[in-house]
Amino acid sequence: MTEWYVDRFVPADSIQQKCFYIEEREQKMKKWIMGSLAILLGVMSISIPFAGIHTAEAKTTEETDKKLNIVTTIFPEYDWTRVILGDRADDVNLTMLLDNGTDLHSFQPAVKDIMKVSSCDLLIYVGGESDQWIEDALESAQNKDMKTINLMEVLGDSIKEEETVEGMQESDHDHDHDHEDEEEKEYDEHVWTSMRNAEVICDAIAETLEEMDPENKEIYQSNAETYKEKLSVLDEEYQETVDSAKQKTLIFADRFPFRYLVDDYGMEYYAAFSGCSAESEASFKTVTFLAGKVDELGVKSVLTMEKSDDRIAQTVIENTKAKDQKILQLNSMQSITSEEIADGATYLSVMEDNLGILKKALN
């Protein structure tokens, strides 16, 4: 990765050229993965008994057959499903694929991941461009009775096209798509950052569980309704916070995966990159634009994503007049680990923490 020095800017042309080579390499890797899926699944069907590949842990065939195998790709799906299952969670093998801190956009499936997807009883996934490998794996799935929940399909017309706001740095990837297919639309995958979307998705999860396990239908319905009430209460707190805020604009010196969140509450934002961008270096133009917006709006903080390098935010601040803004982090839940879950992280707890950050950022 190119180093960023705060005492000078990296020329935009140089950054774009480097990003082009990075994206070209990533595209070749993705093609290799896609080409390997068919061969891999074919080998699996011959060499691995169906009953033994439901989970990564060593379980007897009898134990595995007694339990539903549910695979989720990311943390929000996992946590919603866990809550709706309630006491029934002990009778289900619930797996989260992205549990080691890798985010949705950079995840590359291993053999064990494809095995889990191929043989599970229920698969819950986002369904955006980053999940293309799942669509390919499903075509050769071993369990032909598998049920799936595609979040973007569940939300239908509620999903949003990716947007480039004023001052946002476009990547070579964006330009390539413009030239390849003028009619092709790209949609923002980060649907889980909206608690209103979460309520709709929880209904879909509960309904699917009811179909698969009708004897416990009332449990799933009750758990989903109780959880949705908690989501609704927190949603109202967010709205009240924004309505009473001194200003309603966020300055994001990073990728911006919070489009659904800000749209829910009527906030505005300026960001260095879109939520799905592969960029990691901001151009002189991008940095100076964001610094100018900080000065113009008089905001006291610059935001980044969780586990993000703060170099761009630091450089933006150093180019403002006051040079004393704080750096705050919003958690998009793209890289929650199994260790964090063991320590008590939940979708609601993360969104509550994000509300606290927003209160500081908007006031």
Please report, for each region that a protein language model flagged, where it lies by residue.
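Short, Lys/Arg-enriched N-terminal segments with co-localized hydrophobic residues
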Residues: 3-28
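Short helix-onset patch at the extreme N-terminus, typifying the N->h transition
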Residues: 7, 34-37
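Extracytoplasmic metal-acquisition and chelation regions
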Residues: 20-22, 30, 34-35, 42-363
